[in-house]
Amino acid sequence: MTSAEDRRLIARWSHRFGFGPKPGQFRALVDSGIDRAFNSLIDTTPSLFDIQLINELLSIKDLGDQPRSNTPQIVPYANEKRRQIRALTLWWISVMCSTDNPLSERMTWFWHGHWATSFQKVDEPLLISMQNFTLRRNALGNFRQMCKEMVVDPALVYWLDAQSSTAKSPNENLARELMELFILGVDRYSEMDVKQAALALTGYRLKKSSGVVTYNAALHYSNPVTILGKTSPLDALSLVDLLVDQDNCLRFVSERLWYRFVSTSAPLPSDNSLKQSFNNRDISSLIKIGRAHV
């Protein structure tokens, strides 16, 4: 018979690693026993969908360039954008409610908040859809791979104005957020690191309506840059490698997941078990160690 403490743990895990149990699920988890319940709730099977199929189903597509505001085409264009983003939002809520992979969906939602982007500025449902599928594909995979895909994610590129950054006029927004919010954390880099990283991120162009990101070598700063004490020529992907290799990346991601899944006030374990489990930057390994703490 499952103890009251085990029932409490299963209930807690259900809400931490998912969105709470579906009808009848809590009883099934309790009946399965504490070990099987935990393994079921931390099932790292990715919540994958065919993006082309879903976009076709929801009629999310490239609408082309925005018509001028004083033309009759602007109203149906704006209405169609609103319809598309509403359809995508309702689809994702439906998936959250019905998924058989709650941890994967919860982690997709977690990374959606981590890589903060908003439709209010991006204003292209297709780009938001593309980002959602990038996040769910990498939600429980390798953090390095996620960062490499996200640094050239069209919604993030536009959100942080990276599409206009050139060697002669570098934009620091993506460089700063990449270090502060996405990979290293606050006060773990210098202002000179930001300026140099901004140079590494130059030369990327975006076709906004389609989400196609391209690289123009003529607009990229090709000379060596010095970031976190290391000097070499860098582009977006090699910059990600440099940042993800830092001990502060290991520390930052461990902190972020600890605060989301365990406690906003309790410190990380002093035995460094969380950080050690993330040595290879595998997100699922970091999640699986959570049983001892959640």
Question: Residue ranges of each PLM-predicted region?
Answer:
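Structural motif
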Residues: 1-9, 83, 98-103, 189, ...
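Cell-wall polysaccharide-cleaving catalytic domain and substrate-binding groove, primarily
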Residues: 2-52, 152-156, 164-165, 177-180, ...
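Generic detector of short, locally flexible boundary/turn motifs and exposed helical patches
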Residues: 3-5, 69-78, 110-112, 143, ...
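Hydrophobic/aromatic-rich, well-ordered segments within soluble, folded domains that form packed cores
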Residues: 8, 12, 102-117, 139-152, ...
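Short, compositionally biased low-complexity segments
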Residues: 8-16, 59-65, 80-83, 169-173
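N-terminal accessory alpha/beta regions
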Residues: 23-138
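Active-site substrate-binding loop specific to GH73 endo-beta-N-acetylglucosaminidase modules
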Residues: 88-92, 124-291
